[in-house]
Amino acid sequence: MAYQAFASYYDRLIGNEVDYRARARYFDALIRRYADTPEQNLLLDLACGTGSLSVELSAIGYDVIGVDASAEMLAEAAAKGRGKILFLCQAFDTLDLYGTVGAVVCALDSLNHITDTAALEAAFARVALFTAPGGVFVFDVNTPYKHREILADNTFVYDLGDLFCVWQNTTDASLQTEIALDFFLRSGACYTRESERFCERAYTHETLAKLLDQAGFDLCAVCEGDTFDPPGETAQRAVYIAKRRCGRAAAVN
């Protein structure tokens, strides 16, 4: 899905919870540890959102391409990139670059937004198609534990003074979570209301590992959060590092 109303408020609600500079350094460490290609400084930030991570990766020295399906999010990203980063409006299943990159990152549970296994398989195939042999695909996902115990059927409220947000979750037995966001922006004595609706799905490790293998990736490691340790039973975020095998990627429809 592509954010619309959420784009205007994303950085205020999410930005304060994420240290993008630290996250960029963490991804950089993983890329340097596992990548084996002369193209590794050419990097794709897939589902780049408002571009905060893209900017930090660019500052480290990567030649960054940012891709997102939301034109509204990319408008925010372009203002931050100041012409130094190429931003493209593309969905996972229509990813189309001019050549291969040495590294692909996909952060902040973006892949959880793909709620159909066949669609996730297609997305992995597109990523493999544009990843150079020896290049790496680094992504994070919300875990089944987070969907079951943290998101669940809970409601979260954010009060930022002039901006009020109600975040409501409904999670089913398959660990697909429907998320309803209602934003109230104050202007004087009045409030403007906007809403956003989307779904996220938790995938098992076995499913992710199988789809990566089918796409032409070797799974190098799975880490918890921003660590280099394996995920524990109560891990809310898992980071996958996979290396592109030599040879053809999986067939792309």
Give the location of each predicted region.
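A short glycine-rich, Lys/Arg-flanked "PGG" loop and its adjoining helix->strand segment in the class I
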Residues: 121-133
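A short acidic, Gly/Pro-enriched loop at the edge of an enzyme's catalytic core
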Residues: 96-103
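SAM-dependent methyltransferase
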Residues: 138-211
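C-terminal lobe and adjacent flexible extensions of AdoMet/dcAdoMet transferase-like proteins
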Residues: 205-253
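Conserved class I S-adenosyl-L-methionine
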Residues: 1-47
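Class I SAM-dependent methyltransferase SAM/SAH-binding core
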Residues: 44, 51-94
